[in-house]
């Protein structure tokens, strides 16, 4: 089940962006996942180092003298090495998954393009109506702006009383346009869901490209990923042992020294 969900997210992540954003340069699913993971890891790494630095420069940190920053930098170096080792392995996993789902992604892309072509006139009409409303609103505001410049409105309350009906009118018109657009697009949204259901049902009936096969292939790729990542994870564990041992020794030594100072007072 998890593998099927992974495939579904992978497919939609590959294609849904192009439904509304054709002008952006294409980006592979792996690039998006890698960018997200890199930003997250770097954020955690930077914020974690800041916390360690703040503690080490505090009064208690100076008394304990744990050399946390040295240990943190060693840990960061080890983790970066792990990321470099796993890079080709995870890239191979995504390449295999992309290859296995190529046909299904092409069909989904075709469906999305067809639905987009059908709804585009409604979107264009909505944009046209909205622009007309904004132009009309601007025209109605022009006399108020002129009065304000000429000093005819002495109080801000007078201006607010004149603007409120216009603002309410624009809000009501905008709501009406949005509701109309929602009503117009509803059948196409249902059609897209139906097409997706049809594609998935076809997968179930087609022994050559069934969901069970995708599940098995995804599980196989995940298993291969785990096997190839095992040496790198073992290296990480071996690299962490000296860091943890150094931290343990420093902490116990600092604690013992701190206890002696308290006893002597």
From Swiss-Prot:
Gene Ontology biological process: adrenal gland development; amyloid-beta formation; blood vessel endothelial cell migration; cellular response to lipoprotein particle stimulus; cholesterol biosynthetic process; cholesterol efflux; cholesterol homeostasis; cholesterol import
Family: Belongs to the apolipoprotein A1/A4/E family.
Subunit structure as annotated in this protein's UniProt entry: Homodimer. Interacts with APOA1BP and CLU. Component of a sperm activating protein complex (SPAP), consisting of APOA1, an immunoglobulin heavy chain, an immunoglobulin light chain and albumin. Interacts with NDRG1. Interacts with SCGB3A2. Interacts with NAXE and YJEFN3.
Annotated compartments: Secreted
Sequence repeats: 66-87, 88-109, 110-120, 121-142, 143-164, 165-186, 187-208, 209-230, 231-241, 242-265
Organism of provenance: Aotus nancymaae
Protein name per its UniProtKB record: Apolipoprotein A-I
Keyword field: Cholesterol metabolism, HDL, Lipid metabolism, Lipid transport, Lipoprotein, Oxidation, Palmitate, Phosphoprotein, Repeat, Secreted, Signal, Steroid metabolism, Sterol metabolism, Transport
An example Gene Ontology CC term for this record: spherical high-density lipoprotein particle
Role of this protein: Participates in the reverse transport of cholesterol from tissues to the liver for excretion by promoting cholesterol efflux from tissues and by acting as a cofactor for the lecithin cholesterol acyltransferase (LCAT). As part of the SPAP complex, activates spermatozoa motility.
GO molecular function, one term: high-density lipoprotein particle receptor binding
Disulfide bond annotation, renumbered to this chain: none
Record note on modification: Glycosylated. Palmitoylated.
Modified residues (Methionine sulfoxide): 108, 134
Domain of life (superkingdom): Eukaryota
Gene3D superfamilies listed in its UniProt record: 1.20.5.20, 6.10.140.380, Apolipoprotein
Gene: APOA1
Main location per the UniProt record: secreted
Signal sequence bounds: 1-16
SUPFAM superfamilies: Apolipoprotein A-I
């Amino acid at each position: 089940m998890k593998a099927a969900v992974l495939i579904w997210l992978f497919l939609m992540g590959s294609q849904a962006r192009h439904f509304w954003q054709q002008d952006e340069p294409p980006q592979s699913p792996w690039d998006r996942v890698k960018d997200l993971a890199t930003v997250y890891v770097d954020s955690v790494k930077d914020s974690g180092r800041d916390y360690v630095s703040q503690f080490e420069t505090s009064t208690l940190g100076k008394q304990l003298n744990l050399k946390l920053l040295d240990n943190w930098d060693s840990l960061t170096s080890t983790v970066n090495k792990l990321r470099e080792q796993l890079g080709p392995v995870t890239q191979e996993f995504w390449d295999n998954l992309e290859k296995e789902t190529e046909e299904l992604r092409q069909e989904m892309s075709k469906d999305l393009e067809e639905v987009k072509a059908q709804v585009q006139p409604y979107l264009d009409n909505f944009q046209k109506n909205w622009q007309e409303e904004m132009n009309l609103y601007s025209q109605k505001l022009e006399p108020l702006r002129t009065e304000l410049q000429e000093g005819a409105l002495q109080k801000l309350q007078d201006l607010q009383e004149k603007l409120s009906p216009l603002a309410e009118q624009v809000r009501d018109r905008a709501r009406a346009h949005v509701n109309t657009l929602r009503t117009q697009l509803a059948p196409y949204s249902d059609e897209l869901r139906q097409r997706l259901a049809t594609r998935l049902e076809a997968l179930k009936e087609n022994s050559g490209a069934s969901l069970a096969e995708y599940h098995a292939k995804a599980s196989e790729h995940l298993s291969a990923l785990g096997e190839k990542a095992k040496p790198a994870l073992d290296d990480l564990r071996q690299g962490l042992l000296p860091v943890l041992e150094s931290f343990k020794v420093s902490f116990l030594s600092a604690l013992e020294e701190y206890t002696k100072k308290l006893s002597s007072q």
